[in-house]
Amino acid sequence: DSLPSKKARTVALKRDRKRVHNLQKAYQKQVLKHGDPPILFDILEMLGKPRVDEILARNEEFERVPPFGEEVVVKIDRLSSHGDGLALTPQGDRLLVVPFALPGEVVRVYPYASDRFVFKSRIVEILERNASMRKESLVQCRYFGQCGGCQYQMIPYEQQLELKREVVRRAFMHYSKLDSSLVPEVLPTMPSPERMHYRTKLTPHFDLPASLRRAYGKEVPAEPVDVAIGFDNPSTGRVMDIEECPIGTPVLNEAMKRERQRVR
């Protein structure tokens, strides 16, 4: 195959520079509004501050370096505060964010999207499982593993509670600005009397078809619209059509049925 022309390479370089510039602006805006994201502390701990500073000095924190776009085998180090598996790339200069992967597991993943110091990745194959945490028999939702609404269904409940306790402990450690001796002990997470059907808040999403988005402000068709209403698939970024959530309370699920029908 012939190499891209000089003009094509120049256009691609300008496009990538614009992408990085826009990402940097968006990140700065996010930090001003919400403060440092929790994953920043995982980045500093796992890459090491000297490596992070080196990448920042080269202005390369958003670059799509290898193994972006290539399958790679890694070992999951920990879970993020959002419940996603985290692993270092073989090069040691990026974090892979892997939904539904567990600490200690060896997984083949595909990094498909990039952010600041991280590549969002999907599991291709689990090569070595964490047998003490991954209990597939606990899963009660047919969408689990695709839907991004929850991450812990395959984990025994007692371990879920400890994971949530650790999230709170790390939040105090990183955001309180207190000396470690002044940070209060985080007590064990109080269990819910219900293992399922306990969540009292759900936030379903929907995407209008492109034809309706283009017709914004015009007359809306009277016939029902085939639109997915549910929760995001983290691997595709698309909304999955989900009629019921087994974690939500019965009252919420009844309300969701009505609202789904009303939107359609």
Can you describe what each PLM-predicted range is?
Residues 2-264:
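Accessory RNA-recognition modules of RNA-modification enzymes
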